[in-house]
Amino acid sequence: MPQSMTNAFWHNFLGHTPNWYKKTILGFLVINIVLSQVSPFLAGWALIIEFIFTLAMALKCYPLQPGGLLAIQAVLLGLTSADSVYHEVLANFKVILLLMFMVAGIYFMKDMLLFVFTKILLGIRSKLLLSLLFSFVAAVLSAFLDALTVTAVLIAVAVGFYAVYHRFASGSGHGNDHDHSADDNVHDLHREDLDTFRSFLRSLIMHGAVGTALGGVATLVGEPQNLLIAEIAGWNFIEFYLVMAPISVPALIGGLLTCAILEKTGICGYGAKLPDSVRQILVDFDKKETAKRGFGDKAQLLVQAVVAVVLVFALALHLAEVGLIGLLIIVLLTAFNGITDEHRIGHAFEEALPFTALLVVFFAVVAVIHDQHLFTPVIDYVLAMEQGAQAPMFFVANGVLSMISDNVFVATVYINEVKAAFDAGTISREHFDVLAVAINAGTNLPSVATPNGQAAFLFLLTSALAPLIRLSYGKMVIMALPYTIVLGAVGLGSVILFY
């Protein structure tokens, strides 16, 4: 209990986070004031490093609060403006719509997803085959849907599996309220199996998450920056696929081979198998659910399955923006499954809205990068090189910058600079196409290195699943490292060989 008002304010500041973390954030705020007076450029780079720190410490404190304080200070210090932040948010409004509605739509589909994936998980005993399936299916889906949507599905499935076993391990009855984020009631007998199960889920989720990048690089609709680059280059769906195939196909093969090697060797946190005791619990759960499933439950599953088909076709044919399709899914699922209570509907939005707010804070950091021209020296350096070396260097530069910033922003900056060079007659149309391919590959493949680069990875890191399976920023970086090396090497090699 705080003994004074000063102690009370300190206790309330960032809540239950450790004192060293609170002092670090305050230190950042003080340092930024000094740096902004010396060099706004340096202050901008300091802000990027500080924001990455808040992401890395996501399990200590949700990054929205410390990151938000840093973003507010950046505006107050003049490193960017409220108008610039608004412009960045507006430019990414499609992503915000997606998070608001599509993730909530997936929430209302979780019974069907858990049903399908339970059958898959229990039907395939080989962890290697299961991992390859997760990675390949995620890649195929991401090529036609959206990486965030696919990640939301993976998260919903993993949370469902985890909750089933955690309830059993805690001795909680099926009908009772249960907090699967608390381990206080987990019996000692089940703790080892629970830890192994966490490791099992971590590896599957990371294989699936990287799979979204493998598929995302291949098609026009795979990632938001693909659409942007294709629009400027004038490529349609088929042209985009064909021009990217010399990179995307080897990357997919390399990614799947990496998946297999990781599961065979067990390095970097992979290789954990589903414990027999956990499998039995899931088998029993599936039998109980099947036995008690009445006509009402079956009707709900059927509705969810039909709406899932509608979702796939609507996204693949791009009938509307992804977020609006998400709203369509919410309306269809709640209307035909009788979910009309406002509080029940509200639960669906709990997962995505904190992350949506965090993403807006991230866009404030992107606004600082833009206004302070933090990436300009790198761009100028690459464009000053001889043409033969530009494509590989564009791939490397885009890859490195996408590891610390949003890959959509990096792609936007680079493709606009290249377009300006083409319009000025500095480069030919053929060379412009080569650089556009290098930019697209560079922002898609190496950006799996950290959660900063891809919105889907950042969403996974800050989701309700991450603390359950002990998936921290550092753990994600370590688990992504083999993929980063392979995809970076394959991508760079393909750019050099084929372009």
Swiss-Prot record:
User: Would the keyword Transmembrane helix be found if you checked this record's keyword annotation?
Assistant: yes
What keywords does the record list, in alphabetical order? Antiport, Cell inner membrane, Cell membrane, Ion transport, Membrane, Sodium, Sodium transport, Transmembrane, Transmembrane helix, Transport
Task: Report how it sits in the membrane.
Answer: Multi-pass membrane protein
Q: Can you tell me where the transmembrane regions are?
A: 38-58, 62-82, 89-109, 128-148, 149-169, 204-224, 242-262, 310-330, 349-369, 393-413, 449-469, 478-498
Principal localisation: membrane
Database matches in NCBIfam families: PRK09547.1
Family the entry assigns = Belongs to the NhaB Na(+)/H(+) (TC 2.A.34) antiporter family.
- What protein am I looking at? Na(+)/H(+) antiporter NhaB
The record lists the organism as Saccharophagus degradans (strain 2-40 / ATCC 43961 / DSM 17024)
